[in-house]
Amino acid sequence: MMVKLRNLVLFFMLLTVVAHILLYTDPAASFKTPFSKRDFLEDVTALTFNSDENRLNLLPRESPAVLRGGLVGAVYSDKNSRRLDQLSARVLSATDDDTHSHTDISIKQVTHDAASDSHINRENMHVQLTQQTSEKVDEQPEPNAFGAKKDTGNVLMPDAQVRHLKDQLIRAKVYLSLPSAKANAHFVRELRLRIKEVQRALADASKDSDLPKTAIEKLKAMEQTLAKGKQIQDDCSTVVKKLRAMLHSADEQLRVHKKQTMFLTQLTAKTIPKGLHCLPLRLTTDYYALNSSEQQFPNQEKLEDTQLYHYALFSDNVLATSVVVNSTITNAKHPLKHVFHIVTDRLNYAAMRMWFLDNPPGKATIQVQNVEEFTWLNSSYSPVLKQLSSRSMIDYYFRAHHTNSDTNLKFRNPKYLSILNHLRFYLPEIFPKLSKVLFLDDDIVVQKDLSGLWSVDLKGNVNGAVETCGESFHRFDRYLNFSNPLISKNFDPRACGWAYGMNVFDLDEWKRQNITEVYHRWQDLNQDRELWKLGTLPPGLITFWRRTYPLDRKWHILGLGYNPSVNQRDIERAAVIHYNGNLKPWLEIGIPRYRGFWSKHVDYEHVYLRECNINP
């Protein structure tokens, strides 16, 4: 019995020893397959680097400045190398996250202490990752050399290759300026040749589709040459200093160019093109050659008919006014019911009348008035008219030393001295017998029938307008001075702004609420421009505060005079498109993408336009 018990104990002891051997020994270690290393490398990017950073020697650590300068470049030799760049970028990112506390180590120490090991490790990493990805990449669809996608998850910018070629040129020029590269005459000749090839490939290309088919070959060749330069250059700190100097210089040039662009844009916006100066002169001459009976418009009995659709348009630009009228009538379901009330200044009065006498807008009715004939509109009645004629206001807009202020340059446009801009606050006085008027700016184009706006119930409000809450800079605090207690106590800084340019005004409600008097009171308070500075929108926001009914956005789309990225679908659906901003469609600085919406309503074969050399 004792013998059996002893044997049983020995058996269990032996079993315990064998179990430990089996548990702590990797049975797969003895099986060497060609995939073992590759399978390990596939998990490299998923590793968590919590241990000492020196254990991870896959890639040499580069300083953040070097990475930003573009010294770690991707060699786009083929689709495998593109996959390599993605994996390498993830490894670099993971390494950088856990070594953030070590960023104060100098560039020189990093680049010199690890120079030899870095070169070997980088080559090993390239070979291993290329082997790893060679089979997987074949399963992916072949990407276009200048396509929009690298993979199904990441959408590439349409100018990615153009940017990369430009980056190559910058890096190449840096290498040319370094002493170690200059000492190698063969490398310098090759690099200069590559620079010329890339410059010819780029030419004036702004997106990848503009590049020639050979551009990808030039890109690859340049990368190979730059790789040689990286081997020649052993002092990375010199490269970093050079790139930092270039970056500082580029930033300074950008600042100067931005300031110059802003100034020239403002100057161009305030300048009348030669053709638009010629046009009213020719029209005025021909108008006064007519006899008095020929100077009259037909259908003047319709001017006060409240059953018709009445438009108010205040402008000194003959061509722009004609586009507004033509586009409105072209899209109107019942042109006979539309009446246009145009008010202009003394200089353009004859020209405006002559244009519409010579180019009547179909069956619609036209009225052209001279603002100086409004005898009731004088400085004793209108505070703004008194302010516009004051010496301080003229100095504010015209004195030369003010142009040194970048922030206030846009506020000093003399167009704001024109009373035509402020007539919108006197609609009941101009049209005393009308009940509802649709106000239109002269920089809009009508694309749909607008008669439906007269049936919109404003629910007791005076102004019907499209709100502009979609952008943060279109709220009250961007137009009014909320540091002034008069503003901060009466208005909400985050309240939605709204758009001038297409507004429905209920003139009966206007009179009932005495809106003109509200406007006058706030203009008196703003005599020193402490409440607002720019134009007519700020006083409009104040005057119609809590008296504005929000219209559907489809009625009015803005931004075509300053924003080159307005959604095309929004433009096509809008009833009115507005070229608010300095880039007007009749100026050479107008955004080309939007000019066609405006120019299609201009007959450039008209005799007056040909004689004044006004072309599309």
Curated annotation (Swiss-Prot):
Tissue: Expressed in roots, inflorescences, siliques, leaves and stems.
Cell location: Golgi apparatus membrane
Ranges facing Lumenal side: 30-616
Ranges that cross the membrane: 7-29
Record flagged with keyword Lipoprotein: no
Keyword annotations of the record: Cell wall biogenesis/degradation, Glycoprotein, Glycosyltransferase, Golgi apparatus, Membrane, Signal-anchor, Transferase, Transmembrane, Transmembrane helix
Protein name as catalogued: Probable galacturonosyltransferase 4
Species name: Arabidopsis thaliana (Mouse-ear cress)
